[in-house]
Amino acid sequence: MTNAALTDAAIAAAAAEAAPMPILVAPHAVLRRKTREVKPEDMAEIRRILPSMFSAMYEAPGIGLAAPQVGLSLRFALVDLGEKDAREPIIMINPEVVAESETLAAREEGCLSLPNQYAEVTRPEQVRVQWRNVDGDLMEREVDGLLATCMQHEIDHLEGVLFVDHLSTLRRNMILRRLAKEQKMKRS
């Protein structure tokens, strides 16, 4: 395991002791804003809240969570495809897709900010992603499959894009109306 993976794992392990942050639900305005780049002076605050973000993601349960989903308009996100007893956390600061395959793959997606809503989304099958880790080191990884989908989904959040934006207008509107109805029933 690399030093970066050990650091990410240690931060994720602290989630067991952290109170989960509330996850915003669409149509919250923060979810539609493009985030600002994380600067070195932001890192102390980010390190402080990361365990609570992991806690929220694991409790939901989810495999990815972006800062806007917890009300922060900053460019960072978490992913973890591992099982509870074998976590594989990745903390991505200022991530970007730097290359993508021409081959596309369709995969069913959901989102913690659109609870109980799912749809098949077509994205590049393989991507190369660059990001900074919490120590400021530049990371780069070529990924495919579910991890590629998850990373692209979380990076979309940092651009103010939801998975439903990749669907037809009709399908997107059906999902958003259904979500609004479910949220209204939940409040009453």
Please place each PLM-identified region on the residue numbering.
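Positively charged
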Residues: 1-188
